Amino acid sequence: MPPYAAAAGRPAWSALPAALRGAVAERLGGPVVAVRPAAGGFTRGFAGLLHTADGSASFVKAAAAAEHPHLVEWYAREAAILDRLPVGLPVPRRRFTLHASGWYALGVDAIAGRPPASRDELTAVAH
């Protein structure tokens, strides 16, 4: 299995359709001024931390429906699961979902953290 941090071949934010980028910025409440792409993962969809002019941030995933219908399904399912988690759990909350220019996007709260990396960490989060 390839290393998690080097596995994803993701499109850049600037490569996404302008209408999609505009719709995401509208949902975020202002223009996106900085992007920190997610280097890890195993999908071909966009994923990154977007910072807006007002200083807020959101983690956004996006996929082209025609090219990656399975990712659209996965992201929509993730949004549905996030909506059903009990209040008070230390998890990011869904901020928005949208369809624009043949793409589906999911935005969630930006949280500090990283994926568990060692066997001990994986065991701890599994229990």
PLM features: what roles do these ranges have?
Residues S14-L16, L49, E73:
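N-terminal/domain-start segments enriched in small and hydrophobic, helix-friendly residues
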Residues A47-L49, F59, A105-G107:
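Conserved hydrophobic/aromatic beta-strand scaffold that supports enzyme active sites
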